């Protein structure tokens, strides 16, 4: 009798372990977008590809919301964690996209680009209340970067960069752009190396 229970428990455990990888990589259906906002933490990796796709690598759609608003129909807003998520909740999202124009992080978290993206005409980047945007792998002719209340942006701008920091933060840039900057309340805008 005890052996049957043990065997049943092992079979159940094995079934759960086999199901975990599938659950951990959920495709999230979304309409087309060219802007992303990450709210409340987590990690988003951008990869270049001809077909746009959002994959949830860690986390759950039970706790994380992927929102497209009528007022901004081309922006994907990712709310990392609702009120019910566990204390140690870990969110990781991979987005494959042909291109993106606007990225924002608020309340912590990280958005980074990986791989090779074709050069963009213009990027708009904003961090509010902590977090990081690292798009060094995504070259652009021009960029606007703003940090408010802490955080950092790493950007590859070739011709023009408008950089603003309010209340602390860092903006690092690669390339040789014409720089227009405003810093109030601490922070720095510096060439990367």
PLM features per residue range, with description:
Residues 2, 23-106, 110-126, 137-141, ...:
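Acidic (Asp/Glu) and glycine-rich low-complexity loops/linkers
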Residues 2-11:
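Bacterial N-terminal signal peptides that target proteins for export
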């Amino acid at each position: 009798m005890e052996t049957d229970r043990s065997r049943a428990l092992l079979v159940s455990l094995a079934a759960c372990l086999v199901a975990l990888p599938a659950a951990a990589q959920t495709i999230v259906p979304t309409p087309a977008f060219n802007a992303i906002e990450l709210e409340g933490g987590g990690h988003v990796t951008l990869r270049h590809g001809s077909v746009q796709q959002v994959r949830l690598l860690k986390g759950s759609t039970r706790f994380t919301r992927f929102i497209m608003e009528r007022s901004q129909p081309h922006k994907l807003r990712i709310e990392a964690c609702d009120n019910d998520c566990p204390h140690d909740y870990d969110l990781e999202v991979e987005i494959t996209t042909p291109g993106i124009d606007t990225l924002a992080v608020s309340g912590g978290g990280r958005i980074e680009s990986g791989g090779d993206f074709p050069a963009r005409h213009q990027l708009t980047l904003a961090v509010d209340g902590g977090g990081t945007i690292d798009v060094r792998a995504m070259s652009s002719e021009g960029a606007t970067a703003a940090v408010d209340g802490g955080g950092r942006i790493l950007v590859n701008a070739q011709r023009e960069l408008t950089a603003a920091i309010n209340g602390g933060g860092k903006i690092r840039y690669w390339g040789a752009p014409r720089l227009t900057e405003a810093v109030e309340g601490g922070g720095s805008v510096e060439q990367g190396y």
